[in-house]
Structures are given as C-alpha cells and as structure tokens.
Amino acid sequence: MKPINNHSFFRSLCGLSCISRLSVEEQCTRDYHRIWDDWAREGTTTENRIQAVRLLKICLDTREPVLNLSLLKLRSLPPLPLHIRELNISNNELISLPENSPLLTELHVNGNNLNILPTLPSQLIKLNISFNRNLSCLPSLPPYLQSLSARFNSLETLPELPSTLTILRIEGNRLTVLPELPHRLQELFVSGNRLQELPEFPQSLKYLKVGENQLRRLSRLPQELLALDVSNNLLTSLPENIITLPICTNVNISGNPLSTHVLQSLQRLTSSPDYHGPQIYFSMSDGQQNTLHRPLADAVTAWFPENKQSDVSQIWHAFEHEEHANTFSAFLDRLSDTVSARNTSGFREQVAAWLEKLSASAELRQQSFAVAADATESCEDRVALTWNNLRKTLLVHQASEGLFDNDTGALLSLGREMFRLEILEDIARDKVRTLHFVDEIEVYLAFQTMLAEKLQLSTAVKEMRFYGVSGVTANDLRTAEAMVRSREENEFTDWFSLWGPWHAVLKRTEADRWAQAEEQKYEMLENEYSQRVADRLKASGLSGDADAEREAGAQVMRETEQQIYRQLTDEVLA
C-alpha cells in the first residue's frame, strides 16, 4: 500500500486541525507520539485509547511487526506504524477502515461494525473479517491471499477467489452461489447460507462443510476428503463415490430427505465385510421436522380431557415466552404421533400428569424445556428418546426435592434405573464407534427400548419406529444386559453413594451425619490432600507437570469423597 499522506485521513481519524505535510513514513517518533496522544485525548469515555497508544508506542519503539489492538472498544484508528505486518483490531466498534494502511500480510478485523471494506493490501496472505453483521460485499481480494474467514456477515456474493487460496470459511451469510473454487483449496466451510448448488470441487479439498443450505444435488467428491458435512439440505441422492472416501473420513448426511432406497443401499454396502470406507452419520426422517409450531397452551391442552382444557390453557398461557417454549410446543405435537403414543395404554394420561408437574415447578419446567429443545430436528425416534430423558429429569428432580425421603427402597430402585441407563449409554457410545453407517439416536434408543422390560426401565418407551436401521443386534442386546448386571453388582453402591439426589436426601434426613461426613472430608483434604497428590506425581515421574497435577488432584478428591460417602451410605442403609 502507499504511505498514508492525505490530510483528510488524519483529520478524520485523529481530529487534528493541523498536521505535518510530511508523509507518515518520514515522521519521527516524536511526531507519532504527538499525533497518538492527541487522538487518545479526543476519544469517547467507552474507548480504551490510552491502552491503544501505549501498545502503539511499544510497537514503534521495538519495531515489533505484530500489533494487537483488539478488545479496546475503539471506534476509529490513528495512523499506524508502517513497519507492522500483522494487525489485530478484532472485537472493537469500528465502522470503517482507512483507505491506506501498512504493507500488511495478516489482518484481523472480526467482531466490529464494518459495512464496507477499503482496497486491501496487495501483500495480504490471511484475512479475518467474520462477525461484521452489516458487511454485505467484499472488495477484490489480494492476489496472494491464502486464508479468508468471513463468517456470520451478510454477504450476498463473493468476488473472484485468488488461485492461492487454501482456506475459505464463510458460514452464516446470505450467499446463493459460489464463484469457481481455486485448485489449491483445502478447506471449504459454507454452512448456513442459501446455496442451491455448488461449483466443481478441486481435488485438493480436505474439509467440506456445506450443511444447512438448500442443496438438491452434490457433484463427485474429492477422494482425499477427511470431513464431509452436508447435513440439513434437500438432498435425495448422493454421489456414488461417497463410500470410497478414506476410512478415516467422517461423513454427516443427516437431515436430508434421502429415499428409503438410498438409505438401504448405503446400509447394505457399509455392512459388507469388505467395506473400508468412511463412517457415515445419517438420520431417519419422517418428513415432519420442519412443521410449524402452534401456541404452547394449545399444544399442552391437547393432552387433557375437554373438561380440564380451559383451566390448563389459562395456566400455560403464562409460559408462552419462556426460553424454548416454541420448540417444546413442537415437541408435544410430535410426541403425540410416536409409536408409543399410538399404541401404549394410558400414555396420554401419563403425559398430562407430567405436564401438571411442570406447570407447578419453574425449575423443572426450565430443565424440561431445555431437554426438549432439539427434539424435533429429526425423526420420531429422537422424540421418543427425548421423552425418555424428560422422564428421567422428572424423577431425578422429584428425588432431589424430597419425594423419596421416607422411602429409601424406592430411591434405591430409581438409582438402579439411572445407573443402568448410564451404563447403556456407555455401551451405545461404544457401539456407534463400530458402525460405518449410523444414526446415533437409533442406537441409543435401541438399547433402552429393547432392554426396557428385562432391566425394568420405567422411563424407557417400549416401542420405536426404526429399530431395523439401528445396527444393534440380538447378540449386542444379550451382551449389554450381561454387562449392565455385572457392573451393577460390582459398582452400584459406590455410584449411588456419589449420586446427587441421594446427597440431597441425606442433607434433609441425616443432617448430623452429613455434617460429620463433610467435616471429615475437609479435614482429610486439609491434612492429606497435598501430600497424596505429590506422592502420586512422584510415582509417575510427573512432578512439576501442571496438567498432571490437576488430574491427580481430581483423582484424589474423588477417592476421598468415595471413601467418606460410601461409609456414610453403608451406615444409613444398614
């Protein structure tokens, strides 16, 4: 870029009435300091110009090529030293940039209020202009640019991309079309736009993330892809070479209206003993996830008898504007169309009773709304799994609030169920890792649903729609049941002694014993903690390692609590 030497630039950025006619490059350090000091005095009370000037002076005196003026709430910039090559002015309140600037190779202006950019330095290699919500277009890009991050702006078009570009991150804009992609491009992140088609992919591409667009087709994929995300588009078919991608590649095709034929073909191909392709994440779709929600009170009252609907509606109208109320309304409507709702006797009454409990507890309602927040994004089995989780939330809340204070047997039964579900989640997580074509929701729900009776899981639905695509076999279920019972026999009492609801009961019903246990814990930590951590680090040869010290400290803390709370639990349950 040319040296800054126009008077209007200095007046607009420094507020000076008179300024030297010499170019910035020729001004001495004293002149720089004078200009910056005047600029600092004329700033608003919210700007941290004094700190900015301090950093500018250090940069000038040391000839440091990197200048960081981020997070200072600056609304304008003073003249900058010409020797700097990397400039970070992110997370300020700038609405424009000067037309002239140093010969930068790296520029970070993300998190400002820019609505237009000046001509960019021709030597620029890396540019970050993300999170400028009013920025709708870009100037011509420098010829040697290698990395462009323009995430979450309001861009509607992109200029021609330089051939040197290797990284392009433009998620969360308003793009409907992309220009030709450079042949060296390795990372393309363009999720959350309005794209209906994509240009041909360069073979150099390693990471392709184009989720949440309006794509109806996908061209042939580069064979060296390491990550592919095309979730939440309008794809009904996939390129044939998707199954020939490397085995280490993660592929996400969930949220697309893929035909049953396509899904069955993929499942058949990926289940072959000879398959060595990528792991593919998908979701079963029933075509309802984009339906509009209705008012919360209407969705709730539909679960109640007609003679109660007026009173229920009046109560729930008060919750219409609570966080996640809209998605909770949609969840209730989707829940009514699940297999369990249609086939399980008393299901409607069960839901109505649960809704009454939610209306009486703001804390439980808040927790439940949050649990249901993402439940309608996929198929009805996601809704069913969410219903399982909501019933768990209710029971744990009731236990913490005292429902089982006088019924230790019922609390133990609830604890056993929560323990079994936790183990099943571990088993499901391990199973997901072994599958090449997987909908995680179906795997998690399959273990709960198919073992609900044998493991006495009162919170689990008894039917699911898409068990056939879960990949969970009869042998998996037998192995899981045996593992749950074995771990329950060996681990449950230790787990229960650390369970939060059990602690809440002890605080209320065994206050003196609880206080003694807490005192014992703190005495042990005060007298033994440091030495036990030091001994553990010494034994492993990691003395002085901060990360190892944190890990050892957490282990000692858990062992201490395990010892004390297990002793207390044994005494109370004896």
Curated annotation (Swiss-Prot):
EC number(s) on file: 2.3.2.27
Q: Name one GO cellular component term.
A: extracellular region
The record ties this protein, via SUPFAM superfamilies, to: L domain-like (SSF52058)
Q: Tell me the organism.
A: Shigella flexneri
Has the keyword Ribonucleoprotein been applied to this entry? no
Subcellular location as annotated: Secreted; Host cytoplasm
Q: Which gene encodes it?
A: ipaH4.5
Q: Extract the Gene3D superfamilies matched here.
A: 1.20.58.90, Ribonuclease Inhibitor, Shigella T3SS effector IpaH defines, Shigella T3SS effector IpaH domain
Region: Interaction with target proteins; residue ranges are 1-284
Q: What superkingdom does the record give? A: Bacteria
Which GO molecular function annotation, any one, does this entry have? ubiquitin-protein transferase activity
Span of domain NEL: 295-574
Listed under GO biological process in this entry are: protein autoubiquitination; protein polyubiquitination; symbiont-mediated suppression of host innate immune response; symbiont-mediated suppression of host translation; ubiquitin-dependent protein catabolic process
Q: Where is the active site?
A: C379
UniProt comment concerning the protein's domains: The LRR (leucine-rich repeat) domain forms a slightly curved solenoid and may mediate interaction with target proteins.
Which UniProt keywords are given for this protein, alphabetically ordered?
Host cytoplasm, Leucine-rich repeat, Plasmid, Repeat, Secreted, Transferase, Ubl conjugation, Ubl conjugation pathway, Virulence
- Map out region (E3 ubiquitin-protein ligase catalytic domain) in residue numbers: 293-574
Q: How is it modified after translation?
A: Ubiquitinated in the presence of host E1 ubiquitin-activating enzyme, E2 ubiquitin-conjugating enzyme and ubiquitin.
Task: Name the top EC class.
Answer: transferase
| Chain segments carrying region Linker | 285-292
* Catalyzed reaction equations: S-ubiquitinyl-[E2 ubiquitin-conjugating enzyme]-L-cysteine + [acceptor protein]-L-lysine = [E2 ubiquitin-conjugating enzyme]-L-cysteine + N(6)-ubiquitinyl-[acceptor protein]-L-lysine
Similarity section: Belongs to the LRR-containing bacterial E3 ligase family.
What does the UniProt record say this protein does? Effector proteins function to alter host cell physiology and promote bacterial survival in host tissues. This protein is an E3 ubiquitin ligase that interferes with host's ubiquitination pathway.
The name under which this protein is listed is Probable E3 ubiquitin-protein ligase ipaH4.5
Q: Where are the LRR repeats?
A: 63-82, 83-104, 105-122, 123-143, 144-165, 166-183, 184-205, 206-223, 224-246, 247-270
